[in-house]
């Protein structure tokens, strides 16, 4: 995570020596084993170009970092593993990125795909946000309704169970109100907004309570009754039903790999970006795969 200039300063050597040592560094891929639980994701190496990363879910070791995320690049890498080794993989966690689905099943026939729960909720939240924007634009910009919804839009997006019950003076309404009372007023301005809000909250509730039957039952019952933006999301969810049910029934997610991606961003930021992908890859493996030995403190005897 430290820049090469800082490493050189700490070791009292030249920066060119640090760079030379980095160039000499080699990581050998072990193609004889794969973890039972693996996480897939992508990150931005350069502007406009996404790269692929796979991580061991349990010990957090990086399995591979590939320069691109195309199916050909990923397939060519994992086909270097024997089929028997690939069949040892039982779980793959990933974001909602459909090109990965068929590829994962081809390469790892025994693996279940688990979609990241955060991204499923994020899709619902974005659909609600876009519907809200379309509804608010039906009001005059100078109207009270437009100003109120625009001012308190976060209450519509928020989990209704987390609304504060503290009462404050609200200049927009010229009275003291709780967040729940404000929300009731906002929903009274549009039946369409109220319908989509209650549906959104119910879906979030069933999802967080890990009730797949109720979650998908609600989607199927309302598929033809909702805004096209919600219809698109609902159709995607129904297509990925098995993977979403896995996400609700199994205790795995992409959260650990997202944290790793934040460390990768830190490495990249400290270096002011990398022009050479191999050097970037080496820095990632050094920072994340080499475990530091803990210093054992010895108490001096008097």
Put a short name on every predicted segment:
Residues 1-38, 42-49, 86-89, 93, ...:
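Short, positively charged, Gly/Tyr-enriched micro-motifs
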Residues 3, 12, 23, 27, ...:
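Non-catalytic alpha-helical coupling and interface elements of nucleotide-dependent molecular machines
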Residues 15, 62, 111-112:
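Secondary-structure boundary/capping signal
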Residues 32-58, 62, 69-80:
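Mobile-element integrase/transposase regions
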Residues 47-48, 52, 58, 67, ...:
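Acidic/histidine-rich catalytic cores and adjacent linkers
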Residues 120-141:
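Short alpha-helix plus adjacent loop in nuclease-associated cores
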């Amino acid at each position: 995570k430290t820049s090469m200039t800082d490493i050189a300063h700490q070791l009292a050597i030249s920066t060119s020596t640090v760079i030379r040592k980095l160039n000499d560094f080699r990581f050998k891929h072990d193609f004889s084993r794969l973890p039972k639980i693996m996480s897939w994701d992508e990150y931005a190496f350069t502007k406009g170009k996404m790269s692929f990363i796979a991580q061991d879910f349990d010990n957090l070791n990086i399995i591979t970092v590939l320069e691109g995320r195309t199916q050909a690049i990923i397939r060519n890498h994992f086909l270097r593993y024997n089929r028997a080794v690939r069949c040892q993989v039982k779980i793959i966690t990933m974001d909602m990125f459909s090109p990965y689905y068929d590829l994962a099943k081809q390469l790892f026939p025994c693996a279940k795909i688990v979609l990241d729960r955060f991204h499923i909720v994020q899709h619902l939240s974005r659909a609600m946000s876009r519907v809200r924007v379309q509804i608010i634009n039906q009001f005059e910009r100078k109207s009270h309704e437009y100003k109120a919804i625009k001012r308190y839009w976060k209450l519509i997006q928020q989990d209704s169970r987390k609304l504060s019950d503290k009462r404050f003076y609200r200049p927009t309404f010229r009275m003291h109100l709780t967040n729940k009372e404000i929300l009731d007023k906002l929903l009274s301005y549009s039946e369409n907004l109220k319908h989509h809000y209650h549906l959104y909250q119910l879906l979030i509730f069933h999802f967080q309570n890990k009730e797949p039957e109720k979650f998908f039952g609600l989607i199927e019952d309302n598929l033809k009754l909702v805004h096209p933006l919600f219809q698109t999301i609902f159709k995607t969810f129904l297509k990925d039903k098995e993977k979403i049910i896995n996400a609700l029934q199994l205790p795995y997610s992409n959260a650990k790999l997202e944290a790793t991606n934040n460390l990768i961003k830190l490495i990249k930021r400290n270096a002011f970006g990398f022009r050479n992908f191999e050097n970037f890859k080496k820095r990632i493996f050094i920072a994340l795969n080499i475990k530091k030995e803990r210093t054992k403190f010895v108490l001096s005897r008097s």
